Amino acid sequence: MAQANSRSRNSATISYPEKRRARVNLGKREVEILKTPYLLETQIESYRKFLQKDIAAEKREDNGLHAAFKSVFPITSYSGYAVLEYVGYSLGGESTLFDVEECKLRGLTYAAPLKVNMRLVIYDKEAPAGKKAIKDIKEQEVYMGEIPLMTETGSLVINGTERVVVSQLHRSPGVFFEHDKGKTHSSGKLLYSARVIPYRGSWLDFEFDPKDCLFVRIDRRRKLPATVILRALGYDTEQILDMFYKTNHFHLNQETVTLDLIPQRLRGELAVVEIKDKKGKVIVEANRRISARHIRLIEKAEINKLELPDDYLYGKVIGKTIIDKETGEIIAHANEEITAELLKNLRATKTASLDTLYINEIECGPYVSDTLRLDTTTNQLEALVEIYRIMRPGEPPTKEAAESLFENLFFSPERYSLSAVGRMKFNRRVGRKELTGLDVLSKEDIVDVLRVLVDIRDGKGDVDDIDHLGNRRIRSVGEMAENQFRVGLVRVERAVKDRLSLADVENLMPQDLVNAKPVSAAIKEFFGSSQLSQFMDQNNPLSEITHKRRVSALGPGGLTRERAGFEVRDVHVTHYGRVCPIETPEGPNIGLINSLAVFARANEYGFLETPYRKVVDRVVTDETEYLSAIEEGDYYIAQANTNVDEKGRLVDDLISCRYKGEFTLTTPDKINYMDVSPRQIVSVAAALIPFLEHDDANRALMGSNMQRQAVPTIRPETPLVGTGMERTVAVDSGVTVIAKRSGVIDSVDASRIVVRVDRKETEDDDDIGVDIYNLTKFTRSNQNTCINQHPIVEVGDKVQKGDVLADGPSTDIGELALGQNLLVAFMPWNGYNFEDSILISERLVEEDRFTTIHIQEFTCVARDTKLGPEEITSDIPNVGESALAKLDESGIVHIGAEVNAGDILVGKVTPKGETQLTPEEKLLRAIFGEKASDVKDTSLRVTPGITGTVIDVRIFTREGIKKDERTLEIEKAELSKVEKDLNDELRVREDALFENLEKLLTGRVAAGGPNKLAKGTKITKSYLADLPRQKWFEIRLQDDAATKRLEASHEHFKELRETRDAKLKDSRQKLTQGGDLAPGVIKIVKVYLAVKRRIQPGDKMAGRHGNKGVISTIVPIEDMPYLEDGTPVDIVLNPLGVPSRMNIGQVLETHLGWAAKGLGKKIGEMIEKGADAKELRKSLKPIYDLSKTQRFDLEALEDPEIVTLAKNLRKGVPISSPVFDGATEEEIKQLLKMADLPTSGQAALYDGRTGKKFDRSVTVGYMYMLKLNHLVDDKMHARSTGSYSLVTQQPLGGKAQFGGQRFGEMEVWALEAYGAAYTLQEMLTVKSDDVAGRTRMYKNIVDGDHRMDAGMPESFNVLVKEIRSLAIDIGLEND
């Protein structure tokens, strides 16, 4: 990945773009400890783990495809005599047939074939019992469909469109304890429940009912007493009671009972008798409640026996079954209540002692004991049958069926898996030390869950918070693709099992057993139509990055919009540093779709973690550690802006920190960690908003979302006031071209850059590396915006690995540039900025500041129809010459033609159905072969409302069909482009080769050679210069070593030429081979139109602080308010938009922007006066010295570089004010002072129309404004006549259908109220659904007769038909 390590260079070297234009950083914090991580890491890393493409088969880890295969294979036949084993897999032997760009053009999926090595083992049936003898082993590679590959930028190309698979935030597998918040029962009693959620398999729920009995549900079915599942696990009543209760031991006397006393257990009870110590002193009086003080006294007196009356035992529960030792009969069952009669029986059978359950309202409730009484089952089999009846109602249970069903529910690895995450979470929650174990449940697991649940009901322990990020995990692309793949494999498994059981399995090969269709169908379905596989948002680089970093709680296995409550959507304390609290959509999805914070990443288990700096003994170290939400709770974590001295010691006595999810103050010695950066808590989009800390959260949310909708302008301009994130975003998004290796620029033109790579970067000494970068020119993005790259380097420039060589859309010298810096004034202007309207100057239109290019794609498909093939041709029936003027002889529009709505782009005719011909016509056709009458014109035309220039045409023809002139022409042009690249590469390499040869040959003694080179003469440079290069190899030298090197060079020379020819041949074959088109398609023509959209009233604009508005009018430059020096402002905003919305950041940005522009102006004046590099260096130093930290090193630049830098700063000195660490009021004032501007940030303005000064000074400055992708051109729509609905005959609605305006019920009332009868009649008849009337009307207008006679509206006929359908005969009576 070129981008992945683009920023791994040491910070000492200044990158090429930074030398051209560096930002003044006003952040207060010292140098960033942790560089911003590669922003697309989540996607790329996840998919890399899934494919494990470049890892040898035996070294692959247990995840992704490998894990899916291992979990399904080996597949054994029902008899057990044949086994299909999985050995390994490989992805795409050669490189994929088409690269990403070609796949996009041809509408293909960018994928690699998956070949799996399988082994079929057949065992001998005749072998003696108990021994397995192998009869035959066959190994074979089986093709299992195509697996989509990820592009370098983390997207996938599916059917020619770029898509992104959004990560999902779902509930982690494991066990969760919760209560119903008192909503279930009218009393408001809290009912506790436990739920075991597996990664796949049945859910297991335990719950209390209002009577405190425990119940179990499997897969949310009908509930059963919880003890049924314990019995099904093989426990009997006594064991169950033993697991949940302690017992009290009683000795039976003739009249009384003696209790073996454990004093603690008396707490809270009423004393039935007086309790005395050995001396007879009363400790507790009768009928008093026993308190903790009493218990201490009892323990002190060492009383361990207590004689109690019989009635103390009544109502207590027997803990162990009591058996008559003589007869062996059962006197009392476990869990039976003691009555007077039972005691009498016990004494009669001479039972000496008994155990009762220790049940106490305070710490040990009778829940399990009560549940056992509800449980009708008595043994394991009955319990299994009961469970079977719930899961399979209506089926007769058998012992085997019941046992296998229960076994498969929770204990079979095929049907149930907790996964490593689930097991870790489960063990942690039930308090076990080891964090690994089986993926299925065990008896102990189920018992432990019940134990914890009972403890929580008894008040020991807390319920879980399901919105805690320790209980929600991220599922990324790789994991979701793996799950889909497994689903496909399981479908294959069933088919393979059946085939393995066939008699002739010995003659089959693995290929015959495996059908790859279900697997590729599952993968295709996932990438093509899953809710989480989305059409990539490609408005601008930021929207791409944000889309790839998005985290959604929706999707399969997630929440639904309707069911998600307030808690799930809310910001949670654990979001800190993991998920952005600001960036989320407005509307129904708010809070369900989030964005990863800048530094967040998912750990091995899929939980989000965020980095912190370690603090040891009050000293902040440079060591960083990633903590997940679970680990974070136990530490004191200080904020990033905590005061620290030079040695890194914490200075303050009390430090604001976070502990257990609360914000608190504590002493410095308790602090364990500290935030890495102030922008740690926000996402990429929010981190691009300067002065975010001064904006209200709601507006910041809008600001983050609107930056993603900015359309790339023709001339991007980086913001004067940024945050320092701009470069990172531009580089990581992959829209710029980045140097793969260091080197020198060899040649540059608008569409490609050739770099001669530095020697140290090439693997081979002889080989001189050449990197050729082809730039993307005017390509259409998913949102129809324009992707265009242009170089920023010049020939001879030295570039380092990772430097930006060419800017893409919305980037300016390697920095993100979504909009334009405009001179803004906050003031009202004749009501034109009422309610967020925006007033702009005509200058913005003149200078094309917000002109954008949109590229529309039109596709024309010629198919084989039943009546014959459609034909693409310029011979179209009933079309005038003028309409065909822009087409070539093949019927396809010329490149460069300017077309308007309704113009033909591709001429196409379709055969018409045979019409009944008269005998005369038949004769004529037989004689002349006249065919024109039976085709109809189905040409591709430009849709209404679009005018533009044709910039590209692509033609795809089916194999075996003759290509037309135009296709051959396009192929020829493409080929010459490839040839030029290969020739350039060859030229650079050959130049280097001959350069080395010249060094080798010059001054050597020759042994003969061409051009009469005598033996023994020295070779000179002039001799070599006159000799054609090819002939250098004919020179013979006396030195053997040198001769060998010359021969080696000759070989290398030949090799270079051969490689070039082979590559050219390969490209030619790729270009000329026919397209793989859908069945029935003969030819596809794609025409690309570039539409230039200037800014105009009705377009939506916005700043970065959520300050959005619509342009109300464009005012001539001379009428705009102007400053004292005559500069007219560019844009006028309403000052009332600031106070109520509380986004003050825009005002601070305006002031700082003005200062930045003012400094730039001063530098510009110096350059105009002819200042040299020394003077410029002197004046730039104080500006760059404003940076407290991360200071830009001017000394590292050479003089010419200083001059270039100063020239680039004329438009304004770019400043970065990082989020939550921005410029202070004092700094802004200081900068304004340096720029010789008023420190109030306000200036006197003059009215452009009258020349008079306005009464008050106005806040003026530079603000960064964006043009959003809500353009009035896309919304404007007008219709004369068009398509009508079939049933009602009324015009369709909406722009896409070329529909009309709805004239609804209320509009009718309005006309009725005015008594406008004729207008109303016209609206409801001829303008709508009076079919005959509207045809007559059209005819009348054409004849110049403007009368109207309305007939019967079609909707009346529909009404008549509907009434008739109710069997009521209704009809119109004609007088």
UniProtKB/Swiss-Prot annotation:
Alphabetized InterPro entries for the sequence: DNA-dir_RNA_pol_bsu_ext_1_sf, DNA-dir_RNA_pol_bsu_external_1, DNA-dir_RNA_pol_su2, DNA-dir_RNAP_su2_dom, DNA-dir_RNAP_su2_hyb_sf, RNA_pol_bsu_bac, RNA_pol_bsu_CS, RNA_pol_bsu_protrusion
Keywords annotated in UniProt: DNA-directed RNA polymerase, Nucleotidyltransferase, Transcription, Transferase
A Gene Ontology BP annotation from the UniProt entry: DNA-templated transcription
Top-level taxon of the source organism: Bacteria
Gene Ontology molecular function: DNA binding; DNA-directed RNA polymerase activity; ribonucleoside binding
EC number(s) on file: 2.7.7.6
Role of this protein: DNA-dependent RNA polymerase catalyzes the transcription of DNA into RNA using the four ribonucleoside triphosphates as substrates.
Family classification: Belongs to the RNA polymerase beta chain family.
Protein name: DNA-directed RNA polymerase subunit beta
Organism: Coxiella burnetii (strain RSA 493 / Nine Mile phase I)
Lineage of the organism: Bacteria, Pseudomonadati, Pseudomonadota, Gammaproteobacteria, Legionellales
